[in-house]
């Protein structure tokens, strides 16, 4: 029994020494694994290398694995490039829709949208194309470097070079197409802009002609001033000013259906007194005549949308005044700014009440409607003269302010149009 135990110990010691000693003339090499093998958890066994040199099969396997890694990297890069091309193509499609009028709207630009301005669209496309070119050049340089450093067999290098060449040509064709589309978009945008500018210039010229009163009226006084909106910027202005007056008569034709109140048909302001002469109806108040900021209420009713002839007389002596509508005297009074002469050198405005000389209009007091035949005399007209003017028996222009085309300017969208004849206005009463 003791002999058997001794023999077993000796065999165990010999086996341990045999395991510790390396195999003479042998060593191991580590081989790169493909991703599939790593994921499967089945690594290839280490291959013993005899004499310190790789066999042709082992060299080919290592080259194939390195080529596979390179191809995987290039696929990822090409995928990013394709995504960039798809993104740029989508932007071009939206841009074409914008240039063709398919993407009209008033919405704000949001994240990812093309800018509304065609100039910004072209600029953004230029930047995108330049970025794509830079990335393509970087990709080409990287691919060539990888191929030159791979040490692959000549057949593999030729195949890879051909595929890279095809890919490069495809990308260059796509870039050329994008550049052509960008150029076409730029040309269409420029043509559309020129057409728009031409239309706007023609419209501006027409508006200027209307503002200057260049429309062909039958006679210098055969026009009306239209003030269609209650704003603080539509008005007419009489070029001439008033001299110092101790009496006056102001007559005009007007038509308005504004409510509440027709607003201010005319106002005359001088330095230090914005309400030197004002005719106004605002809110639910009756029509008022202001002279030197003193007020008289007039029994006139003209907000029915029909033409009406209005005349107002005033004299500084006792501040006497009269009010006529359609040739009929409807009211009279006194003590309206008595012994106060009308100051000269002021500004006469149609359609707005002035808070300062020539300005600071209030939209709530603006006149809405049409005005014509605004005349001023430096005396009190007789009742029969006013009747004759109202029933079209006579045409008597004012000796201080006559109603003539070249003496009236319009601003802010107010316009001058041919007016109905006096007889047509009478039929409208």
Curated annotation (Swiss-Prot):
One of its GO terms (cellular component) is glutamatergic synapse. Glycans are attached at residues 146, 187, 391. GO terms for molecular function: carbohydrate binding; metal ion binding. This is Neuronal pentraxin-2. Ca(2+) 1 binds at residues 275, 353-355. Residues 221-422 form the Pentraxin (PTX) domain. The lineage of its organism: Eukaryota, Metazoa, Chordata, Craniata, Vertebrata. The keyword Membrane does not apply. It comes from the Eukaryota.
């Amino acid at each position: 029994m003791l002999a058997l135990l001794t023999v077993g110990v000796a065999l165990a010691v010999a086996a341990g020494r045999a395991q510790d000693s390396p195999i003479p003339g042998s060593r191991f090499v580590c081989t790169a694994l493909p991703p599939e093998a790593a994921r499967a958890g089945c690594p290839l066994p280490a291959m013993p290398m005899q004499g310190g040199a790789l066999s042709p099969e082992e060299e080919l396997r290592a080259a194939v694995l390195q080529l596979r890694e390179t191809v995987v990297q290039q696929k990822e890069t090409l995928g990013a490039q394709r995504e960039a091309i798809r993104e740029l193509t989508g932007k071009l499609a939206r841009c074409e829709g914008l240039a063709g009028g398919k993407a009209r709207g008033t919405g704000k630009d949001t994240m990812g949208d093309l800018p509304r301005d065609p100039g910004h669209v072209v600029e953004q496309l230029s930047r995108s194309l330049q970025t794509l070119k830079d990335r393509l050049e970087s990709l080409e340089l990287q691919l060539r470097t990888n191929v030159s450093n791979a040490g692959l067999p000549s057949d593999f290098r030729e195949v890879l070079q051909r595929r890279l060449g095809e890919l490069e040509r495809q990308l260059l064709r796509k870039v050329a197409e994008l550049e052509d589309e960008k150029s076409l978009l730029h040309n269409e945008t420029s043509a559309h802009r020129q057409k728009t500018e031409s239309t706007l210039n023609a419209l501006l010229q027409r508006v200027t002609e209307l503002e200057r009163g260049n429309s062909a009226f039958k006679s210098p006084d055969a026009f009306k001033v239209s003030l269609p909106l209650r704003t603080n910027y539509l008005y007419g202005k009489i070029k001439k000013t008033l001299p110092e007056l101790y009496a006056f008569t102001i007559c005009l034709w007007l038509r308005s259906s504004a409510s509440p109140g027709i607003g201010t048909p005319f106002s005359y302001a001088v330095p230090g007194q914005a309400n030197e002469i004002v005719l106004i109806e605002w809110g639910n108040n009756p029509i008022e005549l202001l002279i030197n900021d003193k007020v008289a209420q007039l029994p006139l009713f003209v907000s029915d949308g029909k033409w009406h002839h209005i005349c107002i007389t005033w004299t500084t002596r006792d501040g006497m005044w009269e009010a006529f509508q359609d040739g009929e005297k409807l009211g009279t009074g006194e003590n309206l700014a008595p012994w106060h002469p009308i100051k000269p050198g002021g500004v006469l405005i149609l359609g707005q009440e002035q808070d300062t000389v020539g300005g600071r209009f209030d939209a709530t007091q603006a006149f809405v409607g049409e005005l014509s035949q605004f005349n001023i005399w430096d005396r009190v007209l007789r009742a029969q003269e006013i009747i004759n003017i109202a029933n079209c028996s006579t045409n008597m222009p004012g000796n201080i302010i006559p109603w003539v085309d070249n003496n009236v300017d319009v601003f802010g969208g107010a316009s001058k149009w041919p007016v109905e004849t006096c007889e047509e206005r009478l039929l409208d009463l």
